[in-house]
């Protein structure tokens, strides 16, 4: 039987917390920042918790986490 592979694109985008929730960072926060206002850039800095409806699919993509 083969080993279950981790989906590398998902592994780079999500981290798992101790409680089992998944944390990710929002996109559009790395460049072309001059036209984005201060409030938007500040909110892009924070990490966000993934909605629980997507947890089952992400657990399938990340079996080792």
Swiss-Prot record:
Recorded name of the encoding gene: rpmI
InterPro entries documented for this protein: Ribosomal_bL35 (IPR001706), Ribosomal_bL35-like (IPR021137), Ribosomal_bL35_CS (IPR018265), Ribosomal_bL35_sf (IPR037229)
Name the record gives this protein: Large ribosomal subunit protein bL35
The keyword Membrane is assigned to this record: no
Alphabetized SUPFAM superfamilies for the sequence: L35p-like
Keyword Ribosomal protein among UniProt keywords: yes
Species of provenance: Desulfosudis oleivorans (strain DSM 6200 / JCM 39069 / Hxd3) (Desulfococcus oleovorans)
Keywords: Ribonucleoprotein, Ribosomal protein
Sample GO molecular function, one term: structural constituent of ribosome
Bias-annotated ranges (Basic residues): 10-19, 33-47
GO cellular component: large ribosomal subunit
């Amino acid at each position: 039987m083969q080993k279950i592979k981790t989906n590398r694109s998902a592994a780079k985008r999500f981290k798992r917390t101790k409680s089992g929730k998944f944390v990710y960072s929002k996109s559009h926060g790395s460049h072309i920042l001059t036209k984005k206002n201060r409030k938007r850039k500040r909110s892009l800095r924070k990490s966000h918790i993934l909605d629980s409806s997507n947890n089952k699919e992400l657990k399938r993509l990340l079996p080792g986490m």
